[in-house]
Amino acid sequence: MRRAAGLSLLGGSGALLALSLFYGGGTSQDRLFWIGAAASLLAGLGVAGSELGATGRIRLDGQGRAALALGLAFLAWSGAGLGWSIAPDRTWAFLNRGLVYLAFFALGLLVAAASPRARTATALGLATLLLGVVGWALLGKVFPGLFPDGGRVARLRSPVGYWNALAFLCALAFPLGLWVVTDRRRPGPVRAAGSLLLYLAAVALVLTFSRGGLVVAAVAVLLWLWATEERLESLGALVAATVPAAAVAGWATTRAGLVDDLQPSPVRAADGRWLALVLVLGAVVALALSYAADRSIERLDPASRRAWGPRLGGALLAVALAGAVAYAAASGGPERWLDEFRGSGEVSQGSARLAELSSNNRWSWWQEAWTIFLRHPGQGTGAGTFEIARRPLRQSDVVTTEPHNLALQALAEMGMVGLSLGLAASLAALAACRRALTCLHGEERRAGLALATVVPLYLLHALFDIDWDLVATSAPAFFVAGVLLGSGQRQARSPARPLRAMAALALGCALTYSLAAP
C-alpha cells in the first residue's frame, strides 16, 4: 500500500508540474486557480495519508524547519498586509499564489518521504518534462499553427507564454541533461535523450533572445561543473551539443520567417520546413559528436580524466574571457555599459538584442520600487500592489505589474520586514538544500546535485524578472526544494495521527476555497 501511495504521489505531482509547464498560461490567475486547487487538494490528501501511515512520514531537520518557518512567516506578513494594502484584492491574489507554491513544496516533501529514490525519479521526470517543453517550443517554429500569436511577435515563448520564462527553463535543462549524459550506467537511448535535451535547449535558448536566460544558463553550467566529479565528461557532452546548436541557431537568425515579427504565414511555414531539416541534421551531428567524445574519454584512465577536466575547462574559460575582453574593447568599456544599462530606451525584439546592454526599463522600475520603499519603509504598500503604487512616479507609458526584481518588489510592497523575511527564507532554503545533499549517496547524490542547481538559479533569475508571477517557473522550483529538503530522512513507521490527518485535509480545502473566493 505504501508503495502504491508513493507512486500515486509521484505521478500526481508529475502531472501537476506538466500542467504548470504546458498550461500555466503565463501570469494568468484563471489557470493558477485550477492548478493550485489540484495541488492543494493533493497535498492535503498526501499529508493526511502520511499522518495515517499510508506513506512515509515527513521529516525535516533543523535547517529545513527553519527554512519552512521563515517561508511561512513571509507569507503571513504578506497576508497581514491586507490591513494596510492600497489594493487588498491584489494582496489576496499574491498570498494565494504563495500558498499554491507552498502546496508544491509540500508535495516535494511528500515524494521525498515516500520513496528512497525520490531524487532520481524527480530529476528524470523533470528532465523529461523539459525535453517536452523545448521540443514543443521548437515545433511551434516548424509548424506555425502550433505557436499562438507567433506571427505578431516571433520571439520563442510557447508553451510557457513568456520568452524569459522559457529561457529560464532552458537553463535548468543544462545541469539535468549533463547529469543524464555523464552517467555511464544508463542505457544508450537514455543518454542520447540527454544529449538531445542539451542540443534542443541550446537552440531554443538562443531563439528566446533572452539575455538573462543566457546568463542563467552559463551559471547553471558552472554550478554543475563545480559540483560534479565528471567534469571532463560534462565538458565533452556540452561542447558536442552546443557547437551544432550554435550553428543551427545562427542560421535560424538569418531567416525572416523564424525571427522577424509580422511575417506572413507562407513565409513562416516555408522557413519552418527548412528549420525542421536543419534541426534534424544538427541533432545527428550532436549525437555523433557526443558518442565520439564519450568513446574518447572512456579510453582515458581515471587519473588522466581528472587531469584533462580542469585543462579543458580552463581553455574554454580563457576563450570566454578573451571574447569578453574583445567585446569590452569594441563597446567602450564599463562606463559606457553602465550608461547603456541605465538608459530608458526599449530594446529591440530581434536577435540584435543579444548584443545590447540596456536594462529595457528595468532600471527605471527599480528606482520606482526604491522610491516607494522610502515612502513606506516599514510595511510597504501591500503585496502585489507595485503596478498601482508606481502610477504617481512613472515617467513613461510602459505598464508593468512588478519591478522585475523580487527583492525590490518585496521591499516596495512589504517593506523592510518583508524583504528581511524573504531573504532569510531564501538563504535558509539554500543552506538546507546543501545540508540535505550530505545525507545522500551514490546515484541519489548525483541526482540531488543536478536538482540542487534549480533553487539558486530560480533565485538568481528572480532578481531581474517576474518568476514569482509564473507558475511555470515557480512550481518546479518549490517542488524541487521540497524534494531536497526531505532528502535523507529515515522512513519510519509511527502511530497514526487522525486529528492531524483531518487538519491537513481541512487546510487543503481551505486553500482551495481561498483561491475561489473573490
Regions found by a protein language model. Give the residues of each.
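Alpha-helical transmembrane segments of multi-pass inner-membrane proteins
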Residues: 1-25, 33-49, 72-82, 88, ...
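Aromatic-rich transmembrane-lumenal/periplasmic boundary elements in polytopic membrane proteins
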Residues: 99, 136-147, 323-375, 379
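TM-adjacent membrane-interface loops and short helices in multi-pass inner/ER membrane proteins
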Residues: 162, 351-400, 407-410, 414-421
